Structure formats: structure tokens, C-alpha cells
Regions:
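A surface/extracellular/periplasmic glyco- and lipid-processing/surface-interacting theme
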Residues: 67-124, 131-406
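Low-complexity, intrinsically disordered regions enriched in charged/polar residues
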Residues: 30-38, 147, 317-319
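N-terminal, intrinsically disordered, polar/charged segments of Gram-positive cell-envelope systems
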Residues: 31-85
Length: 406
């Protein structure tokens, strides 16, 4: 008899959640590759090997799919809801979201990308493991004009791309995995792979990044950085627009127009959160009640100890208003994938949301690459995030037993 594991249970419940998403189910709003890969896309999402007819300038996520404006928008005394899609604050610009792949390796002194630059300015920081159990970041910004120097850069992976696809975000990276290339081709998605040797490093399309060893004896692949100016140049050279008419938000945020907050009344306290991506890649957060931020630290295999996660540009430790830890089935892509990780988004899974020093347990779902990432409470309502920066972890189900908070 086959053993029924926790992952099996989650996959079954996740498939049910995904079917609800595909059938158009929307909970009530709250106040706050190769033949195999293309065939899998065709069977699962109705996508074949030919490119999608949608272009980079496709319509923004519709209100039924993405996080809608809060219910208060029906109040005629309030101005129209026009929130920043990543933070829920009043909209700062009409710029296109930009996601930059950032190196997070810390195995030895030579194989060490930390401390990174520019990640403290990201509105959304996504962390998930890639090959060899090493975690990687996607630093997501509301506008290319808001990006300082950032890096070290790293290659693209489809688990990050799929989170950005519904938002038509500019995905900026140097190199990419074979599955990532397949997703880009099948969905006709315009990203900026500056490692595309047949395109960049040419007179028409110069290499839009720079090298800086920072006076350290680190491997060459950990020395590449970019900046908002270089990203704008790359986009202009490639004919990619950097303006976008977003009408919804990445998560559901408390309404900035009324000053609403999710105070997590009655929720269990959670001042310290410990996340394990693999044996050597662990992330912890400690809640600061004075500024209501979760301060980030990571284990450094190179130094054999936990260290504050700081932005080298400012020297400041990273802090987030919201933390979202989501568990998913993660495994090597089949065949000779070189250990590239496949995240099972379709099945959904468990989610743990942290804000204001408390925790809320729920579920997440993402029915297809083109569907936004959604997070639900036990009663089926969409979880309400507080306005501000968010850290999102996509964690292997197998590490659930090592996850804890108190």
C-alpha cells in the first residue's frame, strides 16, 4: 500500500484549489520542453509549442484574476483606488514592474555573493532554491527609475518568471535555464537575458552591466552588477516599453485611502520566523515592534554562522512589513536537467502570513503561469497585507518540518 505523505495530501487539496481558480472562483472581497515540455504546457494550460498571441503590451491583469481594489472603492466619497501594485501605497509612477535576478551563494569565501547591492530598495524580494540547494533572489521594483546599483546578477529560472508573468514585468537576468527559455518562447514573453551572446555584446546592443570584484578574491561569476540606468538602456535598445497601466495589486493590501491596517487581532504571536530552504540556506526574521518590520538574517556557509542581511549600498539590515512563506512541491526537472528545480504551482499549498508580529495560516494558489499568485485565509477570503515591502519565500514541502516560528 502506498504511503500517504504530507505532500500527497497537499497536492490533492492544491489541485482542488487550482480547479476553483480555473473555473473562475473568486472569494468575497475583504476590507483590506521539447515535445515533453510543450506537450505538458498544452495539456495543462492549453499552450502549445507555438508562441502565444499575447505581446508584452498585453492588458494588465483583470480585476477578476488579480487582487481587486478594496471594497471601500464603492464609497463615492473616496477618490479612485490607484495603489502601487507591489506595496499598496499610493501609486508613485506608471512604470513597468522590473524583476532582477540576484545571486545569493555563500558556500566559501571565493564562492560568495554577499553582501548584495540594491536589494534593500526592492519592494518585493522573492527567495527560492535552485540547483544544489542554493537559494536565489528575485528583487522586484515598481519602476526601473527606482533601481540603484543591484547585484551580483544571476541567471533566470522559471519559478521566478512564472510569478512575474501575469504582471508583464520586465525580467532581467544574465543567462537562463532551458525550462525558463521554453516558458519565454511558448508564452512569447519579452524578458532581458543580457547573457544572450547573439544579441548583447554587439554594437547595437551593448552589454548592459558592469563588473566589480569589490576588492575581494571571488569567482568571476559573482562580480556582475547592473543599475536602473543600464536597465533603461537595455530596454530601449530592445524596444521594450517601461510604462504599464496596472489596475490591480500583486497582493490584496489594506486601503491607503482610509488608513486601514491589518492589526491581526486575535492571531497567534510570531516574533521570530525560521525558514529552511536547504541544509546550508536558511533565512530567519526577528520582529521589531518599534518600526513593525521583520529584520532579515541568513546563514552563511562561508562563515559558518547567521549574519544580518544588509544592503552593501546602505549598510542597513533588510526589513519587511509582510512575510509570506509558501510551501510547494519542488523537485528536479525530469531528464538531464542538471538539477534545475521545478516548482509545482498548479497544485497550490500551505501559506503562512506574518505581519505586525503575528501569524495567519492559509493557502495559496496559482492556477497557471498567466494567473496571479493568490493567498487565502481559512474562511476563503483573500488575506489582507499591510502596506509596505514584502518578502516571499517559495519553500520545498520537504522542509516544512524544519520551519518554525514563535
Amino acid at each position: 500500500m502506498k504511503k500517504i505523505t504530507r505532500r500527497t495530501v497537499l497536492r490533492v487539496s492544491g489541485l482542488a484549489a487550482a480547479s476553483l481558480g480555473l473555473s473562475g472562483y473568486a472569494p468575497a472581497s475583504s476590507a483590506c520542453v521539447g515535445n515533453g515540455f510543450s506537450g505538458w504546457l498544452q495539456q495543462t494550460f492549453g499552450k502549445g509549442s507555438s508562441a502565444s498571441s499575447e505581446s508584452t503590451e498585453a492588458a494588465a491583469p483583470d480585476a477578476g484574476a488579480a487582487s481587486e481594489a478594496p471594497a471601500e472603492s464603492a464609497d463615492s466619497s473616496l477618490p479612485a483606488y490607484n495603489a502601487d501594485p507591489l506595496t499598496g501605497e499610493p501609486r508613485r509612477s506608471s512604470g513597468r514592474i522590473v524583476g532582477v535576478m540576484v545571486n545569493n551563494i555563500s558556500n566559501t569565501q571565493r564562492q560568495n555573493a554577499r553582501p548584495q547591492r540594491g536589494i534593500g530598495s526592492a519592494d518585493l524580494l522573492i527567495e527560492s532554491k535552485v540547483e544544489g540547494g542554493i537559494s536565489r533572489f528575485c528583487a522586484v521594483y515598481y519602476d526601473a527609475n527606482a533601481i540603484p546599483e543591484v547585484g551580483p546578477l544571476r541567471s533566470g529560472r522559471d519559478q521566478f518568471l512564472q510569478l512575474l508573468m501575469p504582471w508583464q514585468a520586465l525580467y532581467y537576468h544574465d543567462g537562463e535555464s532551458a525550462p525558463c527559455t521554453k516558458f519565454i518562447n511558448v508564452y512569447n514573453y519579452s524578458g532581458l537575458n543580457i547573457g544572450g551572446k547573439s544579441y548583447f555584446d554587439t554594437p547595437t546592443h551593448p552589454h548592459v552591466a558592469h563588473r566589480d570584484s569589490r576588492g575581494r578574491n571571488v569567482a568571476y561569476e559573482h562580480t556582475e552588477f547592473t543599475s536602473g540606468a543600464e536597465i533603461r538602456q537595455a530596454a530601449a535598445n530592445a524596444g521594450i516599453g517601461l510604462q504599464y497601466p496596472y489596475e490591480s495589486t500583486f497582493f490584496r493590501f489594506a486601503d491607503y485611502r482610509t488608513g486601514a491596517e491589518n492589526k491581526m487581532s486575535g492571531a497567534a504571536a510570531a516574533k521570530t520566523i525560521n525558514i529552511v530552504h536547504s541544509d546550508s540556506y536558511k533565512t530567519t526574521f526577528s520582529y521589531n515592534r518599534w518600526d513593525h518590520l521583520y529584520k532579515m538574517s541568513m546563514y552563511s556557509r562561508a562563515d559558518g554562522a547567521f549574519e544580518n542581511t544588509v544592503d552593501e549600498l546602505t549598510g542597513k539590515q533588510l526589513g519587511f512589513t509582510n512575510l509570506l512563506v509558501c510551501f510547494a512541491g519542488i523537485a528536479d526537472y525530469p531528464g538531464d536537467s542538471g538539477g534545475v528545480q521545478q516548482v509545482d504551482y498548479v497544485s497550490g499549498g500551505e501559506a503562512y502570513f506574518f505581519t505586525r508580529g503575528a501569524v495567519q495560516h492559509g493557502t495559496w494558489q496559482k492556477a497557471s503561469p498567466e494567473h496571479p499568485f493568490k493567498v487565502y485565509a481559512a474562511d476563503g477570503s483573500e488575506i489582507c497585507f499591510n502596506r509596505g515591502k514584502t518578502y516571499l519565500a517559495i519553500v520545498d514541502d520537504d522542509e516544512w518540518q524544519n520551519f518554525n516560528y514563535q
